[in-house]
Design a protein with these regions (language model features):
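C-terminal catalytic domains of large/alpha subunits in multi-subunit enzymes
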Residues: 1-7, 46-254
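Conserved beta-alpha junction segments in alpha/beta enzyme cores
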Residues: 1-23, 31-33, 38
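Short, aliphatic-rich beta-strand segments
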Residues: 26-31, 180-182
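A broad, low-specificity signal marking well-ordered, structured residues that form hydrophobic/aromatic
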Residues: 17, 27, 245
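Flexible, small-/acidic-enriched active-site or ligand-binding loops
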Residues: 43
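Residue-level signal for tight coil/turn positions that link beta-strands
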Residues: 23-24, 118
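A short alpha-helix capping/helix-coil boundary motif
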Residues: 24-27, 79-80
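Residue-level recognition of alpha-helix initiation/capping sites
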Residues: 39-40, 94
Length: 254
């Protein structure tokens, strides 16, 4: 079987992010999306780390607080990766420009003469450079350039991830019992940012779909009361019911 689920709602969803240089030269990422198991905290921290030439350990993520966080349409499907992820990239680009402005003043040169490289701001054609920690200190004394940037993003398109699923079952024709022996899924979801998280997300979706098809059902008695009133009667699949489960990714550019 083949299925497709969009990455977001085009021309509707909005993702926002704030990236701030902390006192010790690390970064704070403030987002409006809540990590409900989508893995967005980890994935967006990875994006900051790549954009700012630092370790993921140097990025502290602060999740949704509607009183303080920048606006986000919410977490579902791949929206936080595709929409909020772009907002993170844009915020990092803004922050780099601002850090270069602060560093240029410290180095006594123009912003055109500096470059952000390997977590430092260097003066071109010289050995002079300043660290992020040094920039952070300068940011707090006699400075009019903020070491924080916010960006929002909305997309006119929604990339269509595809999945193909193939399953081998064992069927008892007398009782109707179905056993899952082997399930193989091949997923094209663009560029996989975090394969481990994407794999378990896919496995969870597969198990949920199998549960809806083969296990879960609600019936009612003659008085209209549900018979499956607890998990003692309402059967949900576990990993032991799944047999061999395999997930492979086919990367493509969105």
């Amino acid at each position: 079987a083949m299925a497709m689920q969009g990455s977001c709602i085009s021309n509707v969803d909005v993702g926002s992010a704030t990236v701030k240089l902390a006192d010790d030269g690390s970064f704070n990422l403030i987002i409006g999306a809540a990590d409900m198991g989508t893995g967005c905290d980890t994935i967006l921290a990875q994006m900051v780390a790549e954009c700012m030439d630092c370790s993921v350990d140097d990025v502290a993520v602060f999740g949704a607080d509607t009183d303080a966080s920048p606006y986000d349409s919410g977490s579902y499907a791949s929206s936080t990766t595709y929409i909020t992820g772009k907002a993170v990239e844009m915020a990092c680009a803004k922050l780099k420009t601002q850090l270069c402005g602060i560093a240029a003043g410290m180095l006594g040169c123009s912003t055109e003469e500096v470059v952000f490289e390997n977590g430092r701001v260097k003066q071109i054609n010289t050995e002079k450079s300043v660290s992020l920690a040094e920039i952070s200190v300068k940011d707090q004394v006699n400075n009019d350039i903020a070491a924080v940037a916010t960006a929002s993003h909305s997309s006119p398109v929604s990339p269509p991830p595809y999945m193909v699923g193939m399953v081998e079952i064992e069927l008892d024709k007398d009782t109707g019992e179905v056993k899952i022996l082997d399930y193989v899924a091949v997923v094209d979801c663009g560029i996989t940012i975090n394969p481990a998280l994407a794999r378990i997300q896919t496995e969870g979706g597969i198990v949920q779909g199998i549960g809806h098809t083969l296990f879960e059902n609600i019936t009612y008695d003659r008085n209209g009361r549900p018979i499956e009133s607890s998990f003692l009667q309402y059967k949900v699949p576990t990993r032991l019911d799944m047999g061999h489960l395999r997930v492979e990714f086919e990367n493509s550019y969105e």
